[in-house]
Amino acid sequence: MNVEKLKKMKGKEKIVMVTAYDAPSARIAQDAGIDIILVGDSLGNNVLGYENTIPVTMEEMLIHVAAVRRGAPKAFVVADMPFLSYQPSLEKAIENAGRFLKVGANAVKIEGGEEFGEVVQRLVESGIPVMGHIGLTPQFVNRFGGYRVQGKTEKSREYLLRSARELEKRGAFAIVLEMVVEEVAKEITEGISIPTIGIGSGRFCDGQVLVWHDLLGLNPDFAPRFSKRYANLYETILKALQEFKKEVKEGIFPSEEHVFTDKSQGGVSS
């Protein structure tokens, strides 16, 4: 997969993107044939235990982007630019985006609308592919006053439409639409030539993205309305750990087949 192939999928084939934060998850995503792996700054609240994405640092993101690349050497990997990694200056944005490409990312994703058009253009001119992200942008949650659906008012609709056109004009190869009302997401998708990838933005985007932990049911306390659980791995893992605990306590594990003696054959698996 590459940028040009993704752009050609618009209106012809739905694009599938999932987040992944480590090598084993990335390998599974690659083996499943997922089009894009996003190493999201959602790493913060899904893996690192933060309340939101604001505390996530470049150093944390770089470690996880590199891990994902090692786990999925053939995948198209997009790295999220974390809070304050691109906002302070164009120079800072180029430097940090370049660091992501050096550890294996194919592109970066930037949250924000028309006000970040120049940042997108400079990155693209520097040889760094950029995916835009408008609608609900979690890094700006304090400005929005919470996680609220976007595009409900005419002012919001006009801003989103302007932003999508500006990001396209500045060279973005795709745009994530997060929690945008379906009608506006459809209007944006039909009004630009680059793909839109929706999360909580209805049925008419050119693709869809979900967070790894949401679609696999790894967090029993959080289930966004717009997401769908395709598995309940929390319960599966919980039961496995409980069974392991029970067998150890009762002396069932390890059994004869799991131990080495002076007559044992073969090596170890770890």
Curated annotation (Swiss-Prot):
3-methyl-2-oxobutanoate binds at D41, S42, D80, K109. GO terms for cellular component: cytoplasm. Pathway: Cofactor biosynthesis; (R)-pantothenate biosynthesis; (R)-pantoate from 3-methyl-2-oxobutanoate: step 1/2. Its cofactor is Mg(2+). Its EC number is 2.1.2.11. It is found in: Cytoplasm. Belongs to the PanB family. Homodecamer; pentamer of dimers. This is 3-methyl-2-oxobutanoate hydroxymethyltransferase. It comes from Thermotoga neapolitana (strain ATCC 49049 / DSM 4359 / NBRC 107923 / NS-E). The lineage of its organism: Bacteria, Thermotogati, Thermotogota, Thermotogae, Thermotogales.
